[in-house]
Regions:
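Beta-propeller blade signature
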Residues: 83-85, 139-140, 191-203, 313-326
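A short helix->beta-strand "capping" segment at the edge of beta-propeller domains
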Residues: 30-57, 324-326
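Structural signature of eukaryotic scaffold interfaces centered on beta-propeller domains
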Residues: 58-65, 110-120, 165-174, 226-240, ...
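Conserved blade-ending motifs and adjacent loop-strand segments that build the rim/top face
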Residues: 96, 101-105, 270-279, 323-344
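Beta-strand-rich domains and repeat architectures in extracellular enzymes and scaffolds
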Residues: 47-81, 298-301
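Asp-box/WD-like beta-propeller blade repeats and closely related beta-sheet repeat scaffolds
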Residues: 129-175, 179-184
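Loop/turn-rich, solvent-exposed surfaces of beta-rich toroidal or solenoidal domains
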Residues: 280-319
């Protein structure tokens, strides 16, 4: 009996040590609390996707508002976006000129949100090379058959955050902009940390920073570059109060409340922790894309070994969470998925398939 008791105590001590180490790594790198979440979502729901037939070149990042589908289309020679009518499948036109003119740009970011001003549909576009923001009047552009830019806002970024560029941008209201600031490589082994920022729209002033991580991680032996350790896909809650971040290399989502500043991480039970980035461990790919409405978060999930640079993985699992981090449903689609966009007008999740 003494021998059995001794083995039992050793096993318990080993488990406690592992748990302490995991909490140490979490607290060392993550700026909030982390809750373990169990998979109580029940059976996987099989979903049959309905085809949307479009007549014309439809490539790139998608965005959808009601009957309008937008593509940030790299195959367009002179414009960045083309728009289709979902009801008819017909192409409405091409918009947002490429070039060096006053209302043109060398590159544009994808659409993150739509809003209306005096019942006219508009969106915010970021031109990084020109350091400008464009307010694109979509309603008038479609009516006139040409790009209508209501407002151009100078928005210098190169000297703002040590050379780190903005990525996702979201208008919280008429005067406040929420922005994701991407990591910036400092050397082959180290990069800056991504964070979120609250800024004024018209005067380009930083009001508050929201840090997700406490410190960078150095690991020359890791199979991925330093700025990819904490890689993620993000989606803002439509009411502008929160953002969800799904991690590319951990089975974890992080929810930041812009009103309270509270940051919570939700990690799948049994999932890897931050120690996976140390040494020569096998780093997997987990979450790929994310979309959200005011009630739920839709995260495209892989959960397997990383794919090669020329491989096209068959990703067809969507995890549905609520805004409290609870996994409420797992969906499995009958086609593989590349990009997603949630239209909150018709309450439809649109997806594109990988281009082979």
């Amino acid at each position: 009996m003494k021998r059995i008791r001794g083995i039992f105590c050793f096993v318990m001590l080993f488990i406690v040590c592992i748990s302490c180490r995991e909490k140490y790594d979490d607290g060392k790198y993550f700026n909030g609390d982390i809750q373990k979440i169990g998979d109580n979502s029940g059976t996987v729901k099989k979903v049959t996707l309905n085809n949307v037939i479009l007549h014309g070149a439809n490539y790139g990042y998608i965005a959808v508002y009601d009957s309008l589908m937008f593509f940030l289309n790299p195959k367009l020679p002179d414009h960045f976006y083309n728009i289709f009518n979902i009801n008819t499948g017909e192409e409405i036109g091409t918009f947002c000129n490429k070039g060096g003119g006053p209302k043109e740009s060398a590159a544009l970011g994808p659409i993150s949100q739509f809003f209306k001003v005096e019942n006219e549909l508009q969106t915010l576009l970021f031109a990084p090379y020109e350091e400008k923001l464009f307010i694109w009047n979509i309603t008038q552009s479609i009516k006139q058959g040409t790009t209508v830019i209501d407002k151009i806002i100078p928005y210098a970024w190169r000297d703002e955050n040590g050379g780190a560029c903005y990525n996702e941008m979201y208008l919280q209201d008429d005067s406040i902009l929420l922005a994701r600031v991407d990591p910036f490589p400092l050397s082959d082994e180290e990069s800056t940390l991504m964070f979120y920022q609250k800024r004024t729209l018209d005067t380009n002033k930083a009001l508050k920073n929201y840090s997700i991580y406490k410190q960078t991680m150095k690991n020359e032996e890791a199979p991925i570059i330093s700025e990819a350790f904490f890689a993620s896909a993000d989606a803002f809650k439509p009411d502008g109060t929160k953002v969800v971040q799904v991690m590319g290399h951990l089975s974890q989502l992080n929810i930041l409340d812009f009103e309270t500043g509270q940051l919570m991480g939700y990690r799948m039970e049994g999932g890897d922790d931050f120690s996976i980035f140390q040494g020569k461990k096998n780093i997997k790919n987990y979450y790929v894309e994310v979309q959200a409405d005011d009630n739920y978060i839709y995260a495209l999930y892989w959960g397997k070994d990383r794919w090669g640079i020329h491989e096209i993985p068959y990703v067809n699992t969507i995890h549905v969470f609520d805004w409290y981090g609870k996994l409420v449903q797992k969906l499995e689609t009958d086609y593989d998925i590349d990009k997603m966009f949630l239209d909150t007008v018709r309450n439809r999740l649109y997806v594109t398939r990988p281009k082979s």
